[in-house]
């Protein structure tokens, strides 16, 4: 259990290090107006904090820096929310200023604004397409042999595919087929489409359409949309501006980790609990993340959780500001998407 004096000194050390990036010594602390203690007393308390594992020495300075344990205590017990400026609020509102047509575009824009506001790297995990339901199928003929198949989901996700139209299928049959598919499949989850087509819809098509089977496989293949969530990155080079990453080896390790999207995807998928989550350094259990912290929040439509937005920064990140911004964006994103979904 830390004493009140130790808590104060730990908080001031971490606040100062986050702001300056420089190790903090007893002399620096003795000049802080909130610490009315002698240098000798401060040194003794710092020695105790070091022994307890909350701060540690660096090789290049007599000052101390926070350890992972120190940051964890700081995030869990010492943080207070930071007020957003009017400029911050206006930037966040700009995400939703235009009419929403496609959910993924809004999520991507959110990632960009998060990166701009924090000067760190932001990541957004879009909704799982497998959770989407079919809203509409359109087939637009280009000529006698080809057409464009347009698949629209309930979240605004759009897929376009150029397909080959068999010579045995005439335009009126093609139009009839699309009408039957829309009538029978609207509202069906994408993951269930293939099964429903072959078990239920094929019999209806057989009754009404000549040579329906030559076109059916093409339609089924078109509806086979990749079902993993899309991941959007913004500000990946922002990390290079942080002093922690002046070491070329650390930069290489970090960039390699970002490029291996599958590992990062799995990491974000772990952070799918509601609310803000913070993982620091080695807590991320991913090579290249030893000097990084990841802060995540989920967004939803109504009570249905859709995806995750996150900020990746150095362990010396501005936790209070980032958490406040991320919380606001996640909340506003959920509100905007819920309204959009109800109106569509």
Curated annotation (Swiss-Prot):
Keywords: Repressor, Stress response, Transcription, Transcription regulation. The keyword Transcription applies. GO terms for biological process: negative regulation of DNA-templated transcription. Transmembrane segments: none annotated. This is Heat-inducible transcription repressor HrcA. InterPro entries: GAF-like_dom_sf, HrcA, HrcA_C, WH-like_DNA-bd_sf, WH_DNA-bd_sf, WHTH_transcript_rep_HrcA_IDD. It holds the Pfam family HrcA. Negative regulator of class I heat shock genes (grpE-dnaK-dnaJ and groELS operons). Prevents heat-shock induction of these operons. GO terms for molecular function: DNA binding.
